[in-house]
């Protein structure tokens, strides 16, 4: 299935400090999504260029496998949680999320099995431990792996609303 979707992400919603080295992506799945082709994302990333936040790439289905894995995993536990976004990890952002009463889960990459998708394994590990899909899943990175915060919600608007709470 092919299609287009507008995501409510722009420079007003994103501070350059939130953009990780790998860039940001945001995804939104169709109801009953089963695979990457059922998940809309950016064919590229949201990146920081010259201190400004820019979207590099079109928005379409089947494009962001990295963040789509988070969405598809979350939907196995709660079909209503159909959107996710990754942002740069910072301890201050996690503290602010706690102050804003967002639900938070953490996984440690040191315990990650070999030959698995970090996004699937990490998301599943946190969700199973908590018993629900949290607003935030984060890790502190590892050798060659950037620390990351993932924001999960029912829609891109829900995810961006949670992001705005962290600004």
What is the meaning of each model-derived region?
Residues 1-167:
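Conserved mixed alpha/beta catalytic, RNA-binding, or beta-rich assembly cores of soluble enzyme
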């Amino acid at each position: 299935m092919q299609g287009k979707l507008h995501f409510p992400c722009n420079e007003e919603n994103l501070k350059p400090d939130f953009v990780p080295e790998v860039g940001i992506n945001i995804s939104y799945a169709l109801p009953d999504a089963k695979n990457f082709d059922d998940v809309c994302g950016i064919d590229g990333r949201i990146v920081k260029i010259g201190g400004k936040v820019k979207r590099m790439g079109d928005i379409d289905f089947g494009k962001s496998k990295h963040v789509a894995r988070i969405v598809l995993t979350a939907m196995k536990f709660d079909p209503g949680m159909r959107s996710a976004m990754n942002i740069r990890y910072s301890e201050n952002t996690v503290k602010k999320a706690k102050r804003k009463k967002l639900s938070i889960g953490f996984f440690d990459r040191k315990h990650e099995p070999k030959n698995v998708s970090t996004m699937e394994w990490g998301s599943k590990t946190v969700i199973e431990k908590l018993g629900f899909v949290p607003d935030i899943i984060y890790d502190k990175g590892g050798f060659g792996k950037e620390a990351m915060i993932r924001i999960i919600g029912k829609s891109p608007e829900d995810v961006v609303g949670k992001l705005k709470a962290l600004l």
